[in-house]
Amino acid sequence: MKRRNLATVLCALSATASGSTLAAELELYVDRKTKQIFAEPAPGRDKLGTFVQVDENGKLPASAMPATPAQPLPPAPGAATPADTAVAQAAAAPAPVATPAPAKSGDAGKKWYDKLSLRGYTQIRYNQGIGGDAQDLRAPGDRFIGNDQSLGIRRARLVLSGDLNEHVSLYFQPDFASTPTGSTTSNFAQLRDAYADIFFDKKREYRVRVGQSKMPYGWENLQSSQNRLTLDRADALNSGLRDERDIGAVFYYSPTVAKGRFQDLVKSGLKGSGDYGVIGAGVYNGQGANRAERNDSMHAVVHATYPFKFANGQYLEVGADAYSGRFVPTAAAVNIGGRSFTPAITEPSGYTDQRVAAHIIYYPQPFGLQAEWTVGRGPELDVAQRRIRTRSLSGGYVQAMFKHDFNYGTLLPYLKWQTYRGGSKFDTNAPRMRLDEVEAGVEWQPMDALELVFAYSKMKRTDVSTAPYPVVEGDLLRLQLQVNY
């Protein structure tokens, strides 16, 4: 009930008990728990404000108007005399009208912590080797591939997010299923995202994102694992930004039309990447998420993409990304080909680390096609020279998919091919990765809270985790259950 209406009702009620009413000030209080209105203060009650009587049109009654110095007119013949009628005389100064600040509606009146929301998802994954040397396979994107590593919790995420005010929003995401490098136990809590978006206009088209967040290189890198169709990201793009994140500051421009399309591509189940602007530019440390910075230089990144929408409702997104900086790899003693050595790091301030990537996504309505390709230079182990040096790299992927809605949910069959030739800079000694892989699978979404993926993968990839970095071939059957909350 609005304050003015509330005051009107209270004054109207009092008028029934008295033939004439003076426009007196009235202070009202509301109980925090019961929401009842009181005329006296007490613990647990908040003051609504000070009110005066108004008529049904919201105006002060004549009795509340200030007195005038003019003498009253003589009564008409037969009219009642002043002695017969009690007329309220106002004070010399007019009574104040309601004084509290304008009432706030919706979220405007809430505390910032009341506007935060909590959501998340959990992925439970199972891998089973069915051919080749599957037991010797290793992949940066799935630690449950290999000997005695078949079933586990791949991700367990909680996201705390919301608007602190009109110009600042918060995003905080830990992962409770992490395994730090070198650890023999799993399911540690580790930070993934901790950033603030600072908006410069009311439409929220211009913003700066500051903190640890995804850096805008690679469309699939920006796509949430909760929305991604395939089980793992392509190594060609992910090897440039493993964990997809770093600490930095990035400016994004998202015009209203594009912002709405980015949101629709996620909410409609078309596997969008989210809103990272149609243009982005920024700087970041360059050593990766949750890793100490090892030089005084920053990486620079630029990003451009646009989601086109045809007259028939079909979406097509095209764009490109690039980054440049200097990366400091880690070296350790190895034995390769009967020779034991520790690769020399000839550029302690960091090796040239530059990449350019392009993407095109024809969203599954119902047929879809997704492709990315990257080229560049980065640190890589040179076994012959026993040192790490800057070398060229290239790779990418092509993925086809189909979206079918039916009585029991949604089916999304897919086929993905990927390849990569280049250094794996985040692994010790930055060994050269050789990768050729084909994966076929299907995702079934029986309800919003549940997703099930069944896939077959034929892999040929370098084990970049352990020297002498052999190339292993094998076949896998893979299963993942995802719970959204």
Descriptions of predicted regions:
Residues L60-P61, Y252, K259-R261, K271-D275, ...:
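Flexible glycine-rich, low-complexity coil/linker segments exposed to the extracellular/periplasmic environment
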Residues C11, A15, L28-K33, N407-G409:
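Ordered, small/hydrophobic-rich secondary-structure cores
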Residues S105-A139, R143-A289, R294-V301, T305-N312, ...:
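Outer membrane beta-barrel
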Residues K2-L22:
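Gram-negative bacterial Sec-dependent N-terminal signal peptides
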